Amino acid sequence: TDARQSNIPVVQMNEQYQLRISQHEIELDATTEIGVLRGLETLLQLEKNGKAPALQLYDAPRFSWRGVLLDPARRFLPFPTLLRQLDIMAAVKLNVLHLHLTDDQGWRFESKRFPRLHQLGGKQGYYTQQQLRQLVQYAAERGIRVVPEIDLPGHTTALGVAYPELMSQPGPKQPEKHWGVHPAVLDPTNEAVYDFLTELITEVTTVFPDPYLHIGGDEVLSEHWLGSAHIVKFMQQHQLADATALHAYFNQRLHSILQQAGRTMMGWDEITQGSLPKSVLVQSWRGVESLHQAAAEGYDTVLSTGYYLDQPQFAAFHYRNDPAPANRPLPDLS
């Protein structure tokens, strides 16, 4: 059954609060529990040696999506590390944990329907469904949503080790051990792929209640597609001019599967290369220009460019990356 619960934070959660500190009392007003949590975090930051400055403030977030992406797929992170990350996020009022669960280097989601995924793709570690449900609840108690990412159709070496019959070409034999973009890719002409994804995504929704499900969609190398005679024939039969058109065909099929599962598609900015509904959420990693282009086309967007914490930069560098700068107004699409 669908994992959605009443106590899970919603996308447009109300986080605003008012805090008044005088000589004799502290007053915190908020209309939601999450607003109270945010106000208490501010109070903790103001307190020093049992004292806090007299003030009156009204606080509400500028952006409704303030997230952190963790990548345990490439390097497995122990479960307590995920819980600690949620504590840290709550302290600085971040409200979305984007969990990158699958990639060429590993598969970290326990699938009871397709156990070979974690048995062969997660030998270095994976999270049980019980752990992930605990993570979702732990996050909810801190006003944080958890958005899972199942990367498709590329970044699928670990998937291909478990179910090679779903891939565009034979192999791979084992998950990748090195960083990089690898050629393994699902076969978008194989109906068994869509049957597999329908069951897998349904299973994922029983664990993660968030309305968004991230499907990756980035860095899809075309060599396995264009090097397969049956795929080239399929492209010709369906008037798909190139690999970009084939990728768009796959995304459209995947979008329908997500709709049937009651989820909204989210993906990296390459997914805008096809005609997908404007309900799709686009995450830009290639640059601010792709973010503004997607927004101009009517998509909601999330910016990752400029916020890569694995690329050591001064804090000033990150603060210069404004998702909505005043000198670059977005179009009024109302």
PLM ranges: what are they?
Residues K51-L55, Y163, V288:
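Alpha-helical scaffolding within the catalytic cores
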Residues R108-K112, L159-A162, P277-L281, F314-H318:
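Short secondary-structure transition/capping segments
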Residues T1-F63:
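Contiguous, structured surface segment used for ligand recognition
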Residues T264-E270, S275-V280, R286-S334:
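Flexible, acidic glycine-rich loops studded with aromatic residues
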Residues F63-R263:
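Substrate-binding cleft of carbohydrate-active enzyme catalytic domains
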Residues D2-Q5, H24, E33-G35, R75, ...:
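Short, glycine-/Ser/Thr-/acidic-enriched flexible segments
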Residues L43-Q45, Q85, D300, Y319:
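Short, solvent-exposed amphipathic alpha-helical segments in soluble enzyme
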